[in-house]
Every structure is written in C-alpha cells, then in structure tokens.
Amino acid sequence: AMDTSEFQRLDKIRQLGGSSFVFPSATHTRKEHSVGTAHLALLVVRHLRNAQPELAIDDTDELCVGLAALLHDVGHGPYSHMWEPFVRRCTGDDSYSHEGMGARLVRRICTQIKLQEYIPEASVEFICACIEGLSDDAEWPFSHLSEDKRFLCDIVSNKRSGLDVDKWDYLNRDSVSTLGESSSGGFDVTRLVSAIRVVRGPSRCVGEVAFEEKVALDLNRIFKLRSEMHQMVYQHRVAIVAEAMITDAFLAASESEFRITATSEDGTSREFTLGEAASDCGAFTQLRDGLLETLQTSSASGLERTRQILERLNRREFYQEVGRGAILPTKPLCSECSSETEPRDRFCSQCGASTESRRWDLARRFENNDGRECTVVKPQLLSLSKEDCRRAILDRVEGDSVEEDDVLVGITDIKYGWGYQVPDAHHDRLSWQVRDPLAHVLFFNPKDDVERGYHIPSGKLSQLALPKSTHERVLYCYYRGDPSNTAALRALTEAYERYTKSLPGASAAGRSNPTPSPFARKRRMSGDGPPLPVLDRSGGRTLDMDDCLPPAKRYRDKF
C-alpha cells in the first residue's frame, strides 16, 4: 500500500497547512504522520492480542487496522484541511470531505495491490469503517464479522471518547515541531498503550476500549494539549488568514483557463479544472502543495488575480485585521444582565436574577429510558456562523466604500473535551450541551473488576487539572482589499465594532503579541548619538535611557 502514488503523494503535503507561515519548522508531512499512526495502531492491536486472547484478534484484524491507520489521511488535498472548504465553495458540494475521498482512494489502492487475494473482500469496507469510526448509536454494518470486534473501529478513529492513535501521533508530532520538545506538554504513549483493555460499558453488551483509572490525568493532558494546539497553532489567526488567501488564490485559478492534465478514473487522459480534479481519484493524485508554485509559473490566461494574491502572501502582506477579536459567550446568558451562567445555576452570580428564562437554541431531542421526551439545548450564540456575522457586519457598513467580497470573517472554535448533557436547574426535561474531557472515556480497575468499565465524574479529578472554561469562540474580521484604502478600512472597522457591541455577552479578546514598550519607539541604534530623554509620566521627572535598564546592569555599567 505504501508503494502506490496515492500514498506517496502524502510526502508532498504538509501536515499543518498554513501554520508554516507562523512556525517555519512546521514542515512535516502527512506521510510521516500516517506511518507514525500505523505504528501506534499496531502497538495497540498487538498489546490487546497478547493481553486478552479471548478477543480472538487474528492476522486479518491486525492487517485491517494497520492499513486503516496507514491510509487514513490519503484523502487530504493540498495544504491539508484548507482544501475541503475550497472544494465546497468551488463545486457547491457541501458534503465533500477528505474522509469520503479517502474511502474512495482506499478502495482504489486495495484493488491495485490485489488485497482481496489475501483477505475477504468485505474486509475492505471494514478498513474504511476503521478510518471513519463508528458512533456509539451506529448499527454494526458487517455480517462477515462478529460485533464483538466493534472495538477495533475505535483504535484509529474513536467516535465515543475522541482518544485514538491518530490524535496521539499528531498532537505529539505537531507540538514538538512547532512549540519545541521542552514546552510541548506531550504525553507518554507507551504508558497509555499498556493501560488499555477491552471491557463492557455500564449499559453495553459488547466490549469497547477502556483505560486504567491511574492514567486519567494523562488522558486529560491529551485534551489540554489539543486545546492549546488549537489556540496557539491550528487556529492561530495568521495561519487562518494565510489559508484564506490560499483558498482565494485557488478559487481565482478555478475560474481561469488553468488545467491539470491527468489520467482519470476511467483510464483516459484529459484536462481537469481544480474543482473537477478534486472529485476524480485519478486526477486527485496529482494534487500536492506544489500547486501554488505551478500556478505562479503557469502561462494559462486568467491567473492575474491568483498571482496577485500569491505575491501578497510571499511578501507576508496578509489581509488587514479589522478591530480586535471578540470573545463570544459559550455558556448560557442571564436574561437580565447578559452575564455567563452555569447550566446548574438557579440564579445569576452577577445580578442575582433567576436563570429560568435563559435564551437557547435547540440542539436535539431524544427519548430517555422511561419514554419521556427530553430536549438538549445550547446557548444561543453557539449557533452563530461566520456567514451570519459577515452579513450582519455588511448591513452596518455606511457608504459604498466596502465591497461585499472584501470582507472576510473567521471564528476560532476551541473545545476542551467531548460534549455531554447537564440538566437545567429549573426544567427537568431540559438539558444543556456542555463539554467534559473525560465524560465519555471508559475506565477499569485491574485490582477490581476487569470485565466491566465505568465512567469517572469530573468532580473526582483534581480541580487543578480542569480548566475554568471548556469552550472558547473568538470572532475576527479581515479586509481583503487594498490596505491603503483608509476610507474602506475606517467604515468596516466602525461597522464591525457596532456589531460586536450588539452581541450580548461578547468581550474584546487580547492581542496575540504584547503591546510594544513606549521606550522601544524612542531608542536609537548603538553609536547614533546620546540616548534620547524619556518622560516619566508618573512623576514628571526626565529620565535617561539607562534608567530603563535592570538595576544590576546599570550598576555593572558604571564600573
């Protein structure tokens, strides 16, 4: 499977996409991550095979899980996750995903290497299921395989708890590549593998992956690292803008006469637009990160807009940020003072008003064990989309200096853990959708019952290990147009600020970089005359620049 063009192209696709514009060392590829994930998956399968012979894991099971881990990312396009929103906007296909394309490529690879000669043909679909994962309420789709093997689908992509070897590899690999080993806050994978066992849950008849209770804090560290990586790396505002510019360049190229010549799925050689190539397995294998350089040097007509964007990107002239980011509330808001409240609060801690009439949006409805219908809700502003915000900002722009296509809105969405339901303080059939890192993780005690697992309530963990908030959303607005157009920038800034002030519970986000020292703007280069005097605003005394040095250095320089 590794010796195919579908897999080898991953060596030309960076794992972190636009993050390399912020972290120059973030140049590792999807191929490295895929090999690492396959290694970890085989470690887990072999550990379970040796520790629990009763699971009847055979060579075919081990091969399927290993191939699923190795091929789980073959559906990624240029610049990884950025490719999917481009294809959706270009083709209008909102269902397009790298998982769907990956499943098609996996079937193509299995046909090329004649895998059906070694394992049952139905096992190819099992490999795809291991890549996509099975949700807790999904039916078991395979007749050739006992449902007792359902736990195998949790190893590569765990839809129950979110703890899988894919996440273990990319978090450790990405954090070391961007933040460095000393500050990455990594975790010991070998300790986690040795703590795995397949047990039955409290209300299930088939086994699922569980962990020894002693590694609960280690698992919490994984979710903590994930949220930190999203905040500092994956959803860094510069990385988001860089990827937005690349997306705009691809969209402009898709409207030009630029074509990719490739052999299609049916074996014929023809030309494809970028949108067409994204949906054809044959042409898709020709798409790599080098597509940007190809666009810059192509002689196809209609690429002027694409080259203009890429030239700005190369000069790091990113789209202009408008105003300051606005932190959007993620908890229920008090109907009186718009302060955030906890789902179980009966009264607002700020104004003392009752929380009975808090505003919400419907998340889902379901029937509980006694047949009663229950409603799961979420705070109202959690339903706010980027397009909703963009339209609202444009409606508040005064004059005609701002073009509609010049406004770009981004919302960073950082979650700490998996979602679960908390009952409302006033209504017994109403539950709020909140997040808890270990709510869906199954644990066992090797000194007690190794057949039945259990869940650990968040209150049992050390409160030092739990964050004050488990969900953060920040709204940003950018101007795509000419940054020298001060009239448009001023009009857009005023409209954006009016909009953020109208959002209940929203607050200004901090800057990514510290505010520069007032002294830094007045210093001269060394040897460029005497130091400039600086006014001490607190006492009115005129200071020399040497007074800004630490006392130890000031004392040393005198002698």
What are these regions (language model features)?
Residues 1, 206-211, 334, 439-445:
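Generic recognition of long tandem-repeat/solenoid scaffolds
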Residues 1-67, 75-329, 362-372, 378:
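Sequence-structural signature of the catalytic-core scaffold of metal-dependent phosphohydrolases
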Residues 221, 341, 456-460:
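A composition/biophysics-driven feature that prefers long, compositionally simple stretches
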Residues 233, 257-330, 352, 358-559:
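Terminal helices and disordered tails flanking the catalytic cores of nucleotide-processing hydrolases
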Residues 331, 345:
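Residues immediately within or flanking Cys/His clusters that coordinate Zn2+
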Residues 334-337, 348-351:
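Short cysteine-rich clusters marking metal-coordination/redox-active sites
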Residues 341-343, 355-357:
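Cys/His-rich microdomains that often coordinate metals
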